[in-house]
């Protein structure tokens, strides 16, 4: 019953009346003092200027994490790994309404909802044009809808990152503008393992994964390693100063 209730909430939340821009602005203003301090510290720890020009979120279904990258005018810089507390389904794209799969692809954030049942939420443009095209070829009239990145630690087909972390992401996207944020969702980290497509997958999944792999190439693991080393040094220095 709990799973059914969560699934219904994930479907129905976007069907409710969304906040007008004034409500969104009011929420951003309310969040601003805490989020400016938190994000400034987070970006400084990564050695990245704040605020950034653009951001990219990379959701890894296996391992359940959400990477935040920022563009500094020359290249993408890694900022932080956020945990994904809940993401139902398994490897493979979303195919139909109610399959409880998190989609796979490149998406944009198209709505901010400060009145979400999941604290705050950001709606993705799933299904995008590619998703619709594959559904049409296969005769799938309802490929699904209403996919969000949201707060709370429970979800059914969306990405739940917890209330604290969704505040950071919601504020950052609101501050920069939704057109300055992309979301890449992959089944696992193609930078670490060879791409493998399940034998029962539609033929187009291999093409999709090849495309996503090309996009991931702009976000090298070496950049993450460098940030980790920087952060560890900074943390050790802070402890040393405190002593």
Q: What is each residue range found by the language model?
A:
Residues 1-3:
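Positively charged n-region of N-terminal signal peptides that target proteins for export
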Residues 12-14:
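N-terminal signal peptide c-region/cleavage motif recognized by signal peptidases
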Residues 98-107, 111-242:
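Exported/periplasmic cell-wall-interacting domains
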Residues 20-50:
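Extracellular/luminal recognition modules and glycoprotein regions
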Residues 75-78:
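Tryptophan-centered short beta-strand motifs
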Residues 6-7, 17:
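Cleavable N-terminal signal peptides
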Residues 38-56, 68-69, 84-98, 102-109, ...:
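N-terminal post-signal-peptidase region of extra-cytosolic proteins
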